[in-house]
A protein has these predicted regions:
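Extracellular calcium-associated, cysteine-rich motifs in secreted modular proteins
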Residues: 1-243
Length: 243
């Protein structure tokens, strides 16, 4: 029999080179008799690809997938990624360097321990398979791996990407002042010259628009940009909030 285990890979390929017969996963069963030569939970019949005589080597590391415990070299073992195709792009996760298709590679999203990939929002879906890793309502594809506030946490994992004290889930992707910077990354969302960190989410005039998005926070007819943060009458209330 030229294919003793019937996995579609000829014994001549699976036996390996030299006098020693290959047993990749060290389970005591030689590869040519082992339906899962690398013991990653994905059968050789799947990993070999369309031509068993020349099995696939997806990451071009010289180790064919059926013997490679990390076929796409993203740092996450095939045994963890499996054959699921999270982003339905036709490439199973164990071969996909961006399993969720959010534009952030699995090698980044996995975190420091590939055996226990990071799950930022603790929703049971690890970041490399989660389209909204921090659960703030803004997709990772939009937030990206940049770190707007320089706090060491990339936006896709940061609940307050601009560090203004107002959560991204509150600010959202609206661009109040039309400066091409969405509010969740804008330190002055309404462009009135008073930072969001100062204005906060209070709605001083009760008009339904929080101060950080309100050009006239106290509703006195004078814009916040004119009134500013000075306290003309010294009563402890800045002019932009003082009637």
């Amino acid at each position: 029999d030229t294919d003793s285990d019937g996995d579609g890979i000829p014994d001549s390929v699976e036996r390996g080179t030299g006098s020693a017969i290959a047993d990749t996963d060290g389970d005591g069963t030689s590869d040519y008799l082992d339906l899962d030569s690398d013991g990653d939970g994905i059968t050789d019949a799947i990993e070999k690809g369309p031509n068993g005589a020349t099995p696939l080597d997806s990451d071009n590391d010289g180790i064919p997938n059926f013997r490679d415990v990390d076929s796409d070299a993203d740092g996450i073992p095939d045994s963890i990624e499996g054959t699921t195709d999270t982003d339905t792009d036709g490439t199973p996760n164990y071969l996909d360097t961006d399993s969720d298709g959010d534009g952030i590679s699995d090698s980044i999203e996995k975190g420091p321990n590939p055996l226990s990939p990071i799950d930022t929002d603790l929703d049971g879906t690890p970041d490399y398979k989660d389209l909204d890793s921090d659960g703030d309502g803004i997709t990772d594809a939009i937030e990206g791996a940049i770190d707007t506030d320089g706090d060491g946490v990339p936006n896709y994992r940061d609940l307050d990407s601009d560090g203004d004290g107002i959560p991204d889930v509150t600010e959202g992707t609206t661009d109040t002042d039309n400066d091409n910077i969405p509010n969740y990354k804008d330190l002055d969302s309404d462009g009135d010259g008073i930072s969001d960190a100062t204005e906060g989410t209070l709605d001083t005039d009760g008009d339904g628009t929080p101060d950080y998005k309100d050009l006239d926070s106290d509703g006195d007819g004078i814009s916040d940009a004119i009134e500013g943060t000075r306290d003309t009458d010294g009563d402890g209330t800045p002019d932009y909030l003082d009637l």
